[in-house]
């Protein structure tokens, strides 16, 4: 897979590909990347890429010409082009999986109040929000998408590890709690079942804890899980 990122601040993006597991994935040729500076395509002598919004209002808007020129440069219309925005489609593990099947992605990093709608209308295939909150940096949101996608590529992560993670496709539950040495820490001990060596009992304990954590922290996912297995615990609303 190749990922192209369009950004006003490329220096935020580049280090992500040069460290830890991502560097290994790049070195092994599983993923390639290109970071494009939008400012390089601005015809303004100061390389400005924003302007005041038509109709008035707070903040500045990213101008269409420099981003359009950058998108034409990378031939974006032949690839899956994403704009990260708080008004986009909510990002999920399923969407990450769908994107991992694409051969090339182009991600536009938003800034300021937003992007001229005409760029979205002309070039963007998918407008994506990484959560119900607002970030000052579209680069941060872009890295969330990149990190979640590359892990699903063949050869990047051990497949067995992916099956046990939160939001895995077999059940959609959050992941169970983890423990490592020491056995006792500040009066808290590792659950005995994890030391028992009984793999079926460990598997059962982890599943129960996974359900409990999902019900507590993500009741919406818990209800989806109940719907999937065709059961109801009698609750009509959160406790």
From Swiss-Prot:
It comes from the Bacteria. GO terms for molecular function: tRNA (guanine(37)-N1)-methyltransferase activity. Its main location: cytoplasm. Its EC number is 2.1.1.228. Transmembrane segments: none annotated. Disulfide bonds: none annotated. It is found in: Cytoplasm. S-adenosyl-L-methionine binds at residues 110, 130-135. It is an enzyme of class 2 (transferase). One of its GO terms (biological process) is tRNA N1-guanine methylation. Keywords: Cytoplasm, Methyltransferase, S-adenosyl-L-methionine, Transferase, tRNA processing. Homodimer. Specifically methylates guanosine-37 in various tRNAs. This is tRNA (guanine-N(1)-)-methyltransferase. It comes from Borrelia hermsii (strain HS1 / DAH). The gene is trmD.
